[in-house]
Curated annotation (Swiss-Prot):
Binding site for 2-oxoglutarate: R346
Pfam families according to UniProt: 2OG-FeII_Oxy, DIOX_N
The protein's role, per its UniProt record: 2-oxoglutarate-dependent dioxygenase involved in glucosinolates biosynthesis. Catalyzes the conversion of methylsulfinylalkyl glucosinolates to hydroxyalkyl glucosinolates.
Residues in coiled coil: none
Domain Fe2OG dioxygenase, first and last residues per copy: 258-355
Binding site for Fe cation: H278, D280, H335
Top enzyme class: oxidoreductase
UniProt keyword annotations, A-Z: Dioxygenase, Iron, Metal-binding, Oxidoreductase
Single biological process term from Gene Ontology: glucosinolate biosynthetic process
GO molecular function, one term: metal ion binding
Co-factor note (free text): Binds 1 Fe(2+) ion per subunit.
Source taxonomy: Eukaryota, Viridiplantae, Streptophyta, Embryophyta, Tracheophyta
Species for this entry: Arabidopsis thaliana (Mouse-ear cress)
Protein name: 2-oxoglutarate-dependent dioxygenase AOP3
Length: 410
């Protein structure tokens, strides 16, 4: 039965065997394009990051999150929502801009350890390897569409931001509500929630701890589905501490409540842990799950694929910015996190690429034709982000479509 479950495409991106211009490069290029067009993401088997480095990064993350709260709170940034976040002792996350650059990584270290800490080198090296992988993937994408001339300009117009995340292990008697795919983009990133379900299964109260990106604002409306095809309209009011340019940050939520008819079966299924479905705003992201799974991706057919962690594998996922750049050829997939493990702490790391401020995202003319008419107007990513924080942006089912879709009437 398990063999019939949908799975993401698995593509080998081994640095040792994949060389530009080789027959394998051409084959992988085609596979990457097909996977992204079909799913918006794929699982990649890599050798760029050794098991030893992965272990060192996990150890460094554990050391990082073990710091006293007052020390962690020194991870601040002039740019809004780019520092340390914690919510009710349930989750924590750090954001590091340009984590792949040693000097920038050291600046992050100085915030937490004025005397310095050598472990940051492992995180920087990890980010550097993932950045190299990301650039290779984006090169493969552009080549597959015959726009090689655009590669250098594109790669030089982006930067990286890393997010390090920790999900605190929950007790066995903790009841949680799964959050479905019908989520207002105002709360358009990963969230984990606790739910209290009445004996009659008719009423729930949800506290949402959101592991999100730069796209979340503090007074948002969220449609939370508890069970199958059941939505709950929930007003979220809280303090925001999400990164301005990172898709896997965190959000402090003040209060969330709602009512829904929840069957016992659905309540049991969703009592594991739910994180709202969302699309990333980035160009691309590379996600690594350390040992404990949780990531799920929604297919075009509406099925959820649960991605199991495996040695030397990562998830490559397209964001809204890439969707716009590629004129909608590559979708930005909905995905969520459901942590079902109990008494185990989950660590995850993600590296996201973003357009630099002032760079205009505009689909190359080769991607616009009769079969694929222009889907999005040119825009600056910063303007998209600012629109997201307006009333119209928060309410739109698709921030990208509402902001720059050719049918948006703007």
């Amino acid at each position: 039965m398990g063999s019939c479950s949908p799975q993401l495409p698995l593509i080998c991106l081994s640095d040792q065997t994949l060389k530009p211009g080789s027959s394998k490069w051409v084959k992988v290029r085609s596979d990457v394009r097909k996977a992204l067009e079909d799913y918006g993401c794929f699982e990649a088997k890599i050798d760029q990051v050794s098991m030893e480095l992965q272990g060192s990064v996990l150890k460094a993350m554990q050391e990082l999150f073990a710091l006293p709260t007052e020390a962690k709170q020194r991870n601040v940034c002039p740019k809004p929502f780019a520092g340390y976040f914690s919510h009710n002792g349930l989750s924590e996350s750090f954001g590091i801009k340009d984590a792949n650059i040693l000097e920038k990584a050291h600046e992050f270290t100085q915030q937490l350890w004025p005397e310095g800490n050598k472990s940051i080198k492992m995180i920087q090296l990890y980010a550097e390897k993932l950045a190299e992988l990301d650039m290779m993937v984006r090169r493969l994408i552009l080549e597959s569409y015959g726009i090689e001339y655009f590669i250098d300009e594109h790669l030089n117009s982006t930067y990286y931001r890393m997010r390090l995340m920790k999900y605190i292990a929950r007790p066995d008697n903790d009841i949680t509500a799964a959050v479905g795919a019908n989520v207002d983009n105002g709360a358009n990133d990963n969230a984990d929630g606790d739910a209290n379900v009445n004996d009659d299964g008719a009423s729930i109260g949800v506290k949402v701890n959101v592991d999100v990106g730069d796209d979340v604002n503090d007074n948002d409306s969220v449609n939370i589905g508890v069970g199958v095809d059941i939505n709950v309209e929930t007003n979220v009011n809280g303090d925001l501490d999400a990164e301005a340019n990172g898709d896997a940050t965190a959000w402090v939520v003040g209060a969330v409540s709602g009512n829904a008819s929840v069957g016992a079966k659905e309540a049991n299924v969703d009592a594991e842990l739910g994180l709202p479905s969302h699309t990333d705003k980035s160009l691309s992201g590379i996600i690594y799950q350390h040992q404990i799974d949780g990531l799920e991706v929604k297919t075009k057919e509406g099925k959820w694929i649960r991605v199991k962690p495996a040695p030397n594998t990562v998830i490559v996922i397209a964001g809204d910015a890439l969707c716009a750049l590629m004129n909608g050829r590559i979708p930005s997939p909905y995905h969520r996190v459901r942590v079902t493990e109990r008494k185990k702490t989950r660590y995850a790391a993600a590296l996201f690429s973003y357009p630099k401020e002032g760079y205009i995202i505009d689909s190359p003319k080769e991607l616009v034709d009769e079969k694929h008419p222009r889907a999005f107007k040119p825009f600056d990513f910063v303007d998209l982000f600012n629109f997201y924080h307006t009333e119209a942006g928060r309410r739109a089912p698709s921030t990208l479509q509402a902001f720059c879709g050719v049918s948006a009437g703007k």
